[in-house]
C-alpha cells in the first residue's frame, strides 16, 4: 500500500468536535476500503490567504494515510460531496515524518518568544553606516573655503 499525507480544510462555523467527527467519518470510509489512518494533527482554526466559499478562516487537519489508491479516491469523492469540507490535498510520500509537522513546530517556536515578533534593529537611530557602494565624499563648497 502507498503512503499519503492528507490536509483537510473544514468550514469555520463548525465546532472542533464536528471537525473530529468528520475525520472519524473519513477514517471509516478509508478503513472500509482497506486503508489505515496514521497520526492525526489538528492545526486549529487558522486564517485563509483568500476567501474560499465565503469563509475567511478554516480548521486545518493533517492526516497520515497508508492505503491503496482506490481507497484514497473514494475518501476524496466523499469529501467533495461533504459541504463542511472547503478544500483538501492528498500527496503521496515515500515515508511519513516522525514527530510533529513543520506547522506545529513553528507554532511552538512562536510561543517560546516573548510575544513580540517584530524584527529587531540595531541601536543608534537612523544611521546604518556606509553602504560601501559609493566612492569617497566630495567636499562641499562651504567646507572647502573654511579649511583654506
UniProtKB/Swiss-Prot annotation:
A GO CC annotation given for this chain: cytosolic small ribosomal subunit
The protein's name in its UniProt record: Small ribosomal subunit protein bS6
Keyword field: Ribonucleoprotein, Ribosomal protein, RNA-binding, rRNA-binding
CDD domains: bS6
SUPFAM superfamilies: Ribosomal protein S6
Protein family per UniProt: Belongs to the bacterial ribosomal protein bS6 family.
Keyword Ribosomal protein: yes
Record's keyword annotation contains Ribonucleoprotein: yes
GO MF terms, alphabetically ordered: small ribosomal subunit rRNA binding; structural constituent of ribosome
Pfam families reported for this sequence: Ribosomal_S6
InterPro entries attached to this UniProt entry: Ribosomal_bS6, Ribosomal_bS6_sf, Ribosomal_S6_plastid/chlpt, Transl_elong_EF1B/ribsomal_bS6
Known role: Binds together with bS18 to 16S ribosomal RNA.
Organism (species): Brucella abortus (strain 2308)
